[in-house]
Regions:
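Conserved glycine-rich Rossmann-like NAD(P)H-binding loop of the short-chain dehydrogenase/reductase
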Residues: 31-48
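Substrate-binding pocket helix/loop in short-chain dehydrogenase/reductase
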Residues: 100-102, 106-114, 205, 209
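Conserved glycine-rich cofactor-binding loop
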Residues: 10, 17-19
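Residue(s) in the substrate-gating loop at a strand-loop-helix junction
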Residues: 145
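Active-site helix of classical SDR
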Residues: 125, 161, 169
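Alpha-helical segment proximal to the catalytic Tyr-Lys
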Residues: 130, 174-178, 237
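C-terminal substrate-recognition "lid" of short-chain dehydrogenase/reductases
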Residues: 122-125, 217-239
Length: 239
């Protein structure tokens, strides 16, 4: 019988203070996981953690800038001290400081986008993988984007970072699968979040995305949750 429960699993969700990350964190807790909610600001992660606990779940909010290696090391040291293991990592934190043609992006904006979306994903996965290898099990879930398959207008550099996330997912899947650690990615289309607000509010950009989506509309954060629960659960043991 398939087991979609996350009972007794320790899960880290980055970018967990809003949008897709918040929806996944709360859904994981509903399925029985203890969730470490991560984002840059302590107030945001505390709010989500408190809402999870008020609903009967288990959660801890830890502020962490995933683009900074020192902050990631502090995060994992605390997770190891308090829980001794990590069963699931959801790499969801993202940055997109620039909308416009790639030829006009500044070096600072380019660096920030890659720092969070590529380096941050890699370092978070690397630290999780080291713990999971010792355990002999674990699931790493990277939130990519359809932009990683075909960079959209005004978001070319962001799309390149998501292409890197897709390639990174394949790399870790090949390296870690033999030791019981799974790595997958979810590549959503346009999702209604604060992060994507500028796209939702632009009739031209909204049309660009929805016209290329078979369902003809954008998604809500809770519509991404089911895939994440599956990939985090033992039901996905061969995925």
């Amino acid at each position: 019988m398939l087991d979609f429960s996350l009972k007794n699993k320790i899960a880290i969700v980055t970018g967990g203070s809003r949008g897709i990350g918040e929806a996944i964190a709360k859904a994981f807790a509903e399925q029985g996981a203890t969730v470490i909610v991560c984002s840059r600001k302590q107030g945001g992660v505390d709010r989500v953690a408190e809402e999870i606990k008020a609903a009967g779940g288990a959660a801890l909010g830890i502020a962490c800038h995933t683009g900074q290696s020192a902050a990631i090391e502090v995060l994992y040291a605390r997770v190891k001290q308090e829980f001794g293991r990590v069963d699931v990592l959801v790499n969801n934190a993202a940055a997109n400081p620039y909308f416009g043609p790639a030829v006009e992006i500044t070096e600072a904006a380019f660096d920030k986008t890659f720092e969070v979306n590529v380096k941050g994903y890699f370092l978070m996965a690397q630290h999780a993988a080291r713990m999971m290898i010792e355990q002999g099990s674990g699931s790493i879930i990277n939130i990519a984007s359809i932009a990683g398959f075909s960079p959209p207008p005004m978001q070319g550099v962001y799309g390149v970072t998501k292409s890197a996330v897709i390639a990174m997912t394949k790399m870790f899947a090949k390296e870690l699968g033999g030791v019981g650690v799974r790595c997958n990615c979810i590549a959503p289309g346009l999702v209604e979040t604060k992060f994507a607000q500028v796209l939702i509010e632009s009739p031209e950009m909204l049309e660009h995305f929805t016209s290329r989506t078979p369902m003809g509309r954008h998604a809500q954060p809770n519509e991404i949750v089911g895939a994440a629960i599956y990939l985090a659960s033992d039901a996905a043991s061969y995925t």
